[in-house]
Amino acid sequence: MIRNFKRTAAIVGVVAASSASLVACGDSNDASTNDTTAAATNADTATNDAAAGDSNLTGTTGQLVAEGATSQQNAMDYFGARYAEAVPGANLAYNATGSGAGVKNFIGDQAAFAGSDSPLKDDEVQPAADRCGGNEAWHLPMVIGPVAIAYNLDGVEDLNLTVDNLVDIFKGDITSWNDPAIAEANPGAELPDENISVIYRSDESGTSDNFQKFLSAASDGRWESSGKAFPQAVGAGANGSTGVAEQVKAIPGAITYVEAGFADQAANIDFGNGPVELNEETVGNALDGLEFETEGHNMVVDAAKLFAMDGADTYPLILTTYEIVCSAGYDDQTRDMVKDFLTVALDSQDEELASEGFIPVSGAHADRLREAVNAIS
């Protein structure tokens, strides 16, 4: 089960305690609906000086178009509403089409920034720089959210799964809930003789990419697949975070990987030192050890080190969603709107964001993010 997490603000304190090593990001809604976050409809392009107020906003109005990860849709909804309040006449249109599509359309100059659960691939770095007028594209992890192993198993409220169990389930080597390997992880539990229905993301997804990185790192390479496209040999696909979550709710015996805010019931995971419940404390313990591959304003999380954590009471299956932005090269209006929106997002790392299952950033990492936003030119 997910206790004291999905609807709690207590995690804010955990992040404050671990802020010396944290950066945030998140993801969002179902791509099939192509929903957008539109918190205001006035697309006037004048500058609203009064909106700048005490928040150091430019007050530039218009529609800011962004696209990408479905995992952060709920966060974008919230940030977009706050943005419209802070800058009357401005609105965010966030298309939750998945990380892959977001990066593609950012590079294609169809979106001002991309939401992605994975950093740019090596062969995307130069095209992104070209899109930015020859300037570097930065990764700004603005939203962090744990990934849950969501399941639908009647009568089993507390389910323990080892990393090996997960690898074997998603490879199709374990096909029944009363398999001896699962029973061994759940002593005394009455597991039903019921088929396991694997549900995976059918769209190109940063969540899939990170989940596969986790499976590989945590199992010493037993999981061999990688990338944003999840293997389709086992189970059935669904589009977006909402899609996989709804499929699990509808299908008895189903299992999937999805952001915690979308999961009603989540398994405890044994990362190597006993089952670990997904809650604010265990996630905070993992965030204490978060490291970065890069310095300066381009903030790429070292996912390999994160996913290899196996400490007791530590839940390292955490999704960091990047807002991929141009460090420079925007036209003046777009630059100012991007900076205003990201500033509002940083000002909105609060209890309401936590209530949606995300982890608000604070302390040193929030400061580092704010410095990066201010440096966009």
Please provide the spans of the model-predicted regions.
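C-terminal motif of bacterial Sec signal peptides marking the signal peptidase cleavage site
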Residues: 20-24
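C-terminal lobe and pocket-closing loops
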Residues: 274-336
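Extracytoplasmic ligand-binding site segments that recognize negatively charged/polar headgroups
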Residues: 146-150, 156-245
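N-terminal segment of the mature folded domain
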Residues: 27, 34, 38, 48-183, ...
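Bacterial N-terminal signal peptides that target proteins for export
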Residues: 2-12
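Ligand-binding pocket segment of bilobal, Venus flytrap-like solute-binding proteins
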Residues: 103, 204-293
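Extracellular/periplasmic catalytic domains that process cell-envelope and extracellular macromolecules
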Residues: 58-59, 106-108, 132-134, 140-143, ...
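Extracellular/periplasmic juxtamembrane helices and adjacent flexible linkers that interface
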Residues: 2, 27, 50, 54-58, ...
